[in-house]
Amino acid sequence: MRIFIAFEGSFEPFDVSADETVEVVKLMIKDYFHIPLSEDKQGRRYLELMYAGAALKDSWSLADVGISFCSTLKCFVKEEDKPTLYVFNAVTQDTMPVMESISLLDKTVSDLRTLVTLRCGLPVSVYCLRTPRGLEMYDCNTLKDYQTDIGTTLRLDVWDGWKEFLMGCLLGQKLKVQRYLSKEGPVLKYQKRVALYIAAFCGYIELTEWALKQGARPHEAVGVHPYRAWCHEALHADVSKCPIHAAAEAGQLLILKAFVNYSVLCLECKNAAGQTPLTIVFKHKHKDCVLYLLSKMWSTVSFPKISVPMRIYIKIKQWILRAQSHSLHKSQFCGARVFGAKVGDTVMVDGFTKPKMTSKSWHKAGNSDSQSIVLKLPSLSKQTASSKPVNPLAISQPDTRKQALKFHPLVNASSFSELQKHQQQNQKKITATARKKEKLIKNTYLPQVPLPPVSRVGYSHPSFFYATPSADFLLKSSFSSFLEHSGKTPWENAIYCLAVAR
């Protein structure tokens, strides 16, 4: 059976059998045209046959795909680059290829982490990279220092107890994010900034609105975990990136609009390289974002008697915020307030402390899920088995000794009613005795206490009026409540106190 092969402008006939596979035909074409093919760690160069617009697989036979006498097949030489490295994400359980040139192996771990952040959307401060042997890779070293070769699979590990939280952020699940927030104050603030960063990168509107309401700001740097707050010299440069930069890199137009409406300072927020959001969207060729940011930057802010260009308005606002920050810092310095790490806080130092970036789950990290706790009531048979008295306050508290709660056994109903009547009679006697004592003191000492005469002298100075509108109401309400609970007016109480004092 004769078929024709079209290759690079030539049209050559080939005699083949209908039972031949596509792979055999490719070998015939390679030998006829002397095409050099190769395959190594960096990539491969191979042939591809197409018939009726579809690519043919090597295992297919010609008859199975309907190739008959005088059919024409197109042949192409294709080159495919293999990933330089692979990164296994412990959060998503996916393996991410890193398609860069071989020169990447001569660069530092810091450069690789910058590329990984642009691909996965995680801030550089929430994860670390490890070699296949589990050795943590530090930013200051090169990839060759860890014997990293082409095709090596590295592992991305996050903070212990953060897997579920970060997965909720990557999926935009607000309830899951709220469920796995930390109970430590500084860590909680850091998690909210991380959530806003990931939401901005992925374009989740609902999660973005929640993070903004929680106090996270789009022009505020994500920063580092509080455990690494003292490792300033070893920090990655991208820890100063803000959520507005993540939205600009990903081309999330709706998020950019929300951030600019929240604060116009986002327009002039710069990253570690000194790039504004407008520069970043230019670099990544996001046309819609470029047009929006340009229109905002060249707009004006109108006041009752003046209109100010947006750039000037941002400068004024930045100057005011710096002045407020300086004044606040000065007042706090005079008050001797101390910020930062305190005694007992966890501090991590590279190479010395036990690593806390091993991607442990929430429960394995020692956290307790309040939503999964189920309280069990003791059985009724055990409640009536003992006659020991039990403190009623202890019923609402968990029993750490795992003992069943025990109550008084039920008594006879007639004896219980008699006991209740006896208690009521005693209470009445006590109340009557107290009232007799009060009357005795009142009748005995009231005539002996002289009251000051009422002054009717007029003064020339104006009367004093209390400015609070509700002052009269507060005084009357306090007097009425005092009379209700004590049974005496404030005037009678004052006389009583003077009499007792004498």
Curated annotation (Swiss-Prot):
Cross-referenced Gene3D superfamilies: Ankyrin repeat-containing domain, Phosphatidylinositol 3-kinase Catalytic Subunit, Chain A, domain 1
Domain of life: Eukaryota
SUPFAM superfamilies, A to Z: Ankyrin repeat (SSF48403), Ubiquitin-like (SSF54236)
Name of the molecule in the record: Protein ANKUB1
